[in-house]
Amino acid sequence: MIGLLLTIDIGNTNLTIGAYSGEELKFVSRLATDRSRTEDQYAIELKSIFDLYGYGFDEFTGCAISSVVPELTGAISHAAKRITGSRRNGPGR
């Protein structure tokens, strides 16, 4: 099985989170952007989304991030790495 790619688009209003297996979109979810949330809070949110759609951490082999909210990029990147163990590709990479 091909590992899943976690995708996160950090927008001013929403975070759009998705997972791809090759070119197939497996799920998409949205969270309200909240600049006051911590890395741990975002990690909990990601874990909840994975649980909601029936995916485990070990199924993710990569992470791609786009962002227009630089002050959240680091926290969300670290949260994604903590959950998936995968290195990210995104702003500054």
Where do the PLM segments sit?
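Short glycine-rich, Thr/Ser-proximal phosphate-binding strand/loop in the N-terminal lobe
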Residues: 2-48
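Short beta-strand-loop/turn "lid" adjacent to the catalytic site in phosphate-handling enzymes
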Residues: 53-93
